[in-house]
Structures are given as structure tokens and as C-alpha cells.
Amino acid sequence: MKLMIFTGLVLFAIVSLIEAQAENEKPCLPEYKVCTHAPGNCCSDLVCDRYGRYKSGAQIGRNCFCLQKGVIYKREN
């Protein structure tokens, strides 16, 4: 009986540890994915860059994307 209780407790501890570890290892956001609400979730070789959206000179919002570090994006006409 004691062995069954001990085994149950050990299994419970292992399952709890696995669930906690899986929760901490959230998948990272790949390149060009929106990171507005999760700026720290971009993959390690990427950075969350923020861009303001403007209409008639007034800012109407922000967009954030996971982009390569050190790369400068320019608008093409």
C-alpha cells in the first residue's frame, strides 16, 4: 500500500514538472510575425521592431513585427 502511494506521488511530481517546463518553453515567433502583444517572444536571431502607422500626419496605431537584427527596411516607391 505504501509503495502504491509513493509511486502515485512520484508520478504526480513528474507530470507536474513536465507541464511546468512545457509552459516555460513557449514557441518563439518566426520572422515577419506580429509581436505587438508579445515583444519578447521573437526567435533568438530576431528582434521585435515597432512601426507607427500614420494617416494625414497623425499616428493612428503601431505595428510590431519580428525582423532580423541590424537590418534596415526602407519604403520603395
Curated annotation (Swiss-Prot):
It comes from the Eukaryota. Expressed by the venom gland. Coiled coil: none annotated. Pfam families: Toxin_35. Keywords: Disulfide bond, Secreted, Signal, Toxin. Residues 1-20 form the signal peptide. The keyword ATP-binding does not apply. It is found in: Secreted. Residues 21-26 form a propeptide. One of its GO terms (cellular component) is extracellular region. GO terms for molecular function: toxin activity. Contains 4 disulfide bonds. Belongs to the neurotoxin 19 (CSTX) family. 08 (U8-Lctx) subfamily. This is U8-lycotoxin-Ls1n. It comes from Lycosa singoriensis.
